[in-house]
Amino acid sequence: MAQTLSKISNKENASVGLWPKRFKPHQPTPTWMVRCGPLDHDSRHGRDPVRASPQAKRVRTPNPYPRHLKPAASAVVRSGTNPSHLKPTSTDVVRSGPETPCCEAKDGGVVRSCKTCNLKPAHDSKAVSFFPAQTDGLTGDEPEFIAEACPSCVLYDTCPNCTSRAINDDGSTDGTIPSWDQIETTPAFLSLLSNTDEEMSADELTNLAAHLRKAFETGSHPPNVDYSKDQLQGLLEMAEAALPPARRQTLPFYQQRLEARRTWREKIFNLPLDELSKILTTSKDRFQRCAAWKVVLEKAVLAKEYGEEAYAYAQEALKNINSFDVNLVLKMAAGTFIGHLRMMTVDNPDMVSYLPKLIVKLKPLTLKMIIDNHENTKEGWLVTLTSLAELYGMVEVAIDFVPTVIGNLFDLLMKTTSKVYSMFKSVILATFTSESLDFTNPFWYAIAAILCFLITGAIPHNGKMKIIKNILSNATGIVAGVKAIQTLGAMFSTWSNERLVNDLSSRTIAITELNNPTITADIDAVINLQRLAETLREEVKSHTLNPLMQPYTPILRNLMSALDNVISCCTRRKAIATKRTAPVAVILTGPPGCGKTTAAFALAKRLSQQKPSIISLDVDHHDTYTGNEVCIIDEFDSSDKVDYANFVVNMVNTNPMVLNCDLVENKGKTFRSKYVIMKSNSETPVKPTSRRAGAFYRRVMIVDVKNTAVENWKRENPGKPVPKWCFNKDFSHLHLSMRGTEAYWREYVLDPTGRNHQSQKAPPDQHVTLEQLDQKMVVQHTTNTSEFVTQAGEVPVFGFVCQNNEIDTVYNLLAAVKARYGANFNLYKGMTRTAHENSGCGAHVHVISREDNFRGKAFTVNRSRLESVPHLEGDSFRRSLGVVMSDKDVTTMFYYIKGKVINDQVNLTELPANQHVVTVHTVYDMAWALRRHLKWTGQWQLIKAAYEIMCYPDTAACALRNWMDSTDFSEEHVVTQFIAPGGTIILESCYGARMWATGQRLIRAGGLTEAGGPQGGVRFAGLGARNVPWSEILREFMTLISHIWSQIKGATVVLTALTFYLKRFRPRVEAKGKNKNKGPRKNTGVALTDDEYDEWRQYKAEKKLDLTVEDFLQLRHRAAMGADDTDAVKFRCWYSERQRNYHDLEDVTIIGRGGVKRELIRKGPLRPRGNDFYDEPDDWYSEGVIDGVTHKNAIVSVDDVDGMHKGYALHIGHGVYMSLKHVVSGNAKILSEEPKNLTFNGELATFRLNTTLPTAAPVGTSKPIKDPWGNPVSTDWQFKNYNTTSGNIYGACGSSCSLTRQGDCGLPYVDDHGVVVGLHAGSGGDKCPSRKLIVPYVKVDMRIRDTCTKEYYKDNVPMISYKGLLVKETGEPRTIMKGTRLHVSPAHTDDYEECTHQPASLGAGDPRCPMSLTGIMVNNLQPYTEAPRTDTATLNRVTKMLISHMEGYVPKIHKTEEDMISAFYMLNHDTSCGPYIGGRKKDHVKDGVLDKNLLDLLSSKWNRAKCGLALPHEYALGLKDELRPKDKVAVGKRRLIWGCDVGVSTVCRAAFKRVSESIMANHALGFIQVGINMDGPAVEDPFKRLERPKHDRYCVDYSKWDSTQPPKVTSQSIDILRHFTDKSPIVDSACATLKSNPIGIFNGVAFKVAGGLPSGMPLTSIINSLNHCLMVGSAVVKALEDSGVQVTWNIFDSMDLFTYGDDGVYIVPPLISSVMPKVFSNLRQFGLKPTRTDKTDAEITPIPADEPVEFLKRTIVRTENGVRALLDKSSIIRQFYYIKAENTENWTVPPKKIDTSSRGQQLYNAGLYASQHGEEFYTNKIIPLVQRAIEFEGLHIEVPEFHQAVQAYNGYFNGTEDQPSQIALASGGTGFGGEVFEN
């Protein structure tokens, strides 16, 4: 669809007189290009013109312009460039273009008739369009003009309004234009709604529009069946929203569409918001909806004129897509609940009398008896209902009413059920026939239509219904039915998404059209517009993350780009209009050569870490200004042509200074440096007689710079250069003297009167150093930044909106309330405000009508009732007005105080009522009382005031004055009277404060404490709750609950205590007969949960006890609280055993003679009970199980061979466990395994298991603080041998209150940090239960000893130097393979020198480069000896940004491959096995079975990896056999081969295979292009992303990429991959391995890499690409922040990248493009070497828009066959020169044997690639090479012609034919196949 937008855009517009590409001036003008009127097709074909019908509707033109855009006079404005709101002042008809008006305007500017244009009256229409006479040679009368009732008809009809008359209802024509059948078969029409590049011609567009016009009028026309009239307009609307306003003229019908929206705007501008909301949600006319959006947003932007309601509505509407306002419903529900609760509790005037009456009415005792005797039977319900009716006196009513209602309902239910059943049965039987399905019943069509309406929000039209019918009618079987349902679901989803995109496009158009200075004239409008654009952008962005919206992602991105332009434009306009802090300017004056420039730069470095910006006043534009904190202006007064005085005055100012810039992107740039350093050789830059002298010298500090050594040298040595010793690094050679303020010379300052400039002597100069000058400038800037801001801020304004006849009533009511509560607000009638906002004033309250344009908090008066003053208590004023106000708003309105006021004169009538009276005896009394008035942030001012009063008690009033100037007061209204020895102080605070202080004793009694204030709670009336925030609703609910509790808390406590008291002494019911001595089973008042009930029954059954429920619960409670009585101890033991054996029981259902019952059956054998006591007091014994121990997730049970629990073991990490010797002795089983590698250290036992728990406990050697159950333990931590029942145990004795039992041995003791320091080994038994025996932890080396794994780089081998490298000897020589498999072709033995590439250097015997292979290897390894550095903080931030970006398209968790063999078969078996096993992987696999050597190696690596441990990271090094440029061959440059160990590759593939596949599968959405097929349709995705408007494109390559990779960046990339895995031990092992330093093995030595990334590392392409993204992102963030732009957003949301290893394409916006030189500089600081793709040393610059982009050695261009990635010609040509065959050292000799089959296929494919470069290259260059190869190499292939080659490649490209293996390999890399053809 996105391509179709450009397809129908002809780049010319009829309104400006431009012709489309396919039309010439001599051709007839097409109908859609006529400016003023349609072609007269009736006259052309010999028919009389048809007059308009009398039923033509009339149109009224309202005047809905806002008051800021009202025209001076009315006029009819037609198509032109003037906006709709700029009306001309004349009464003439205004046309576009320079034509002279030809019509007579009568009746107020309305066109009645025109002889020149042949216009006739159109039924007295108020506003008409007109068409001038035809100028294309046509003759005859013109058709009468008809005023349309709907402005959109101009769009839907357009010029085909006349041509549609030549079309019949069935789609046939009279031959003048094509019929509908012919239209449908045109290629352009068939591609209209498809993703093709064919452009629709103007004739076809005109004919199609004519048929559409006919289809709009006639329902039987064929397009109504197949297509929707909204499809074409929807495409145009999306195109208009995506294009910038300047380019929208290129769209067809743009002026007509614009005129339609303008006309709609005029019609609906004055409608209220609710009517506009209906249009937005229900209108099917897209032009009407778009105009409605523009009206809503325009009123929101101009909130000053139309009120905050419009802005709030627009903000909410932009976020919602026709959604139900659930928030309002919830608010209304909450408000209703609170209101009813208040009515029943607080508002009830007499709770005491109301409750008894309610109880008597309810008759609870009788009601309880009826309920208790109810039975769930028919007779029971009849008796119960009759009893209830008799109880409440409704017997007769029930007898008459209930049977009638029940009977009627039953009859209605039976009839409805019968009819529904019959209909449903008939439909089902008709659908599911015996042979097939039949969905042709209208019932199914209706169901599908309803579903379509529910999903898409619109009823399907005829075309859609036809599609639905076709789908349902074709569903004749089960499979077809399922497919039909899937098809309908997908189709409904597509329609819904299209409607959504159209809606977003309408909003975007409205936003962009409002970005006009004529509309958004003030800063408030600009701010509102930016907020609305940001809101809409977030909405659009949220839809881009929806997977169902992926087909529309390009359109949504274009919408976001358009909104970004609006936001950036608003930002610039705000910056221009925003007040700034005046910079600090200093002028360094002195003679030339004294060192001013060096001092200026040194001062700039002290002031800021950024490099200073440089401005030169000799040029008239300042595009190079960077906006850094410090700005240096050299010789600012050197040119007399520059008005530098005014420049400095404007620069050092609080008003924004807009710089003069030439570049468009820099328009609006402002000066924003903090410090300005200017230099001058003149002591008086501005003459004192100048008119700007005062303003100039007031803004600058002048420092005279003097260098005595330089002056003496010049005086004593004239003509000689100044030596360096005259200058010192510490600037001690300079003498800096700062002048006084306004000193234009050292001796004089400016005269204030301006009469005598030498009348005022200047103060002495102040000697300063650079450091002092730096401090002064910083202090001065801090002073400039600080400005006085009133604490209270803007005075709040409230408005009560009512009818005109209610204004006096509401005003009098508010005046009475103000007098009653002593309120501080100012009351007005209407909008006029008479009170001044002085300190101490209150809020402004206006009583206004609905017509007033009020700005502020408005509350609608639902009713007005003037109460008497005694009735205005509590919240009656809100009830009387029917307004919904929160308590916070009421407090603010009544008692808001602006600023702080201190009154020395006390007037009793002005004093507020006291809330608190405090007698001040000490300073603490006052401090404690003052806390009520302060915020939390103002407590420290309170401490300061208290200290002053304590030191000087007689000056309390003065101390309070000083304290009020600096403190922050609370938003609550508080009044406190302080009675001090020196007088009385009354303090009132609410936002601000008022204080009255007098030396007399004044007692102001009474107040609001008892009567209460006006804050009586929120009253929710109707929909008024929508204006109350949720915080106020919650606050009101909590206040109401506290109020209710304050009324009932006393009675509640008393009744609760009474209930407990009566329950305690309740007599028990004794049973008789058989149940004697048994507790009662019924009506005991005890409720048990299911688990408690099961415990009670099981405990009674096992212990053979007759235990009541109450006794059981008491026993259970005592045991849980740790009681030590016998019953409690036994219950704890039983409960622990039950918990441990929970899984040994099975709940089964038994069916037998006794019926069906459920029982718990034990699955394991019954264990014998152990002994409870030992005779000897010092015996230690093993203990039982108790839940809730520390580190319980790391603890496992140790069982005997028969399943008997023995103790515990603790997991300490990587499969290592520790326990005790007497626990694991014998045949112990842990997790059904026997311990391995069992090691004893005294009593402590350490061992391994194959099972690794996910949780491990930390271990240490400190002193224990807590026992296993978290209780404190006391111990001296002295170790000795103790005699136990298990022998002597070496440990320490401790004391704890925890009770232990058998089986607790092995539980951990921890220190204060939770680290395990010992294990529990026993206790003192029942005679001394608090004594515990603790075995300390001792570190044991449990590292795995490799038995099968070889490792060359060993720690115990000394380091040696080998040819300049630090290496270790391996003891096994490994030589570098010599020779090459590349031979010169027999066809080119004489001219192979013409080829640009040759086989790489072969070593010392090679005449091209005699360097040995070892020397080449060592030279290649030298860069790996150093580790590049990066900015760690920035790198960590960018890593989080990249993860957040990738989470949008990469699934979160990928499962690890757990099978070793499966992981091995995921590898490429044609690659090396690494340093430990020779050959390739496939050499060790026979018939799918691995040989012993490979299997042993993989098993050892896999077992180690399952423990999460790192593997040896070693590689076998070699040199790559490939073709290299001849210049690189001459210097011996040859690339390394890193052969990775097959075990490491298998582990890494198991860990990250699925993650890498997800990243590769989503290359179209992300930055990483690994997996892209460059020879398929996938190449179109990057091509589209490259066409991003207003973005710069950079193509970058890197030299020596592998050796320059920082290890920190590689580690972060590996962590990113781990983030998307399940983090299993295999993943941990892979991460630890890849993060370790690689080891290279060659020539019998092992070399450890310090930095860089081996090219043979697993996942090298993915990791390299992630490294690429991270380093580019870090460089961009650092460059922006160094330029003063703080990056607080995700940088990857602002740019687009293509990365594949070291190849990169960066698509950046202007902001980032402006700092790209710094970005490349930062990349070089990271150690990288960025270059151009052509490998030249020129600067990296953006790729122009008209030049193709090169990526992966491919040039991405659009050819006549589509988008193609062209392989460079040199890569294709050199394939004919060389052949890969047997190994040789004489590569200039052709091979002895040539594989003609593969060689022929190779050259055939080369021809296919060459065909994409054009016929000339293919015919003149490639065909001769192919023919020569056939002749000399003996090949048997046919040379395809050019068009055959193009057709074959297109077949491979589009997937219609399978790609040959070489093309498949080449599409993901740089060559055809193998390393022969790599660059």
UniProtKB/Swiss-Prot annotation:
Keywords from the UniProt entry: ATP-binding, Covalent protein-RNA linkage, Host endoplasmic reticulum, Host membrane, Hydrolase, Membrane, Nucleotide-binding, Nucleotidyltransferase, Phosphoprotein, Protease, RNA-directed RNA polymerase, Thiol protease, Transferase, Viral RNA replication
Database matches in InterPro entries: ARM-type_fold, DNA/RNA_pol_sf, Helic/Pol/Pept_Calicivir-typ, Helicase_SF3_ssDNA/RNA_vir, Helicase_SF3_ssRNA_vir, P-loop_NTPase, Peptidase_C24, Peptidase_S1_PA
Annotated EC: 3.6.1.15, 2.7.7.48, 3.4.22.66
BP term (GO), one: viral RNA genome replication
Binding positions (ATP): G590, P591, P592, G593, C594, G595, K596, T597
Domain called Peptidase C24: residue spans: 1188-1341
Biased composition (Polar residues): 79-93
Listed name of the protein: Genome polyprotein
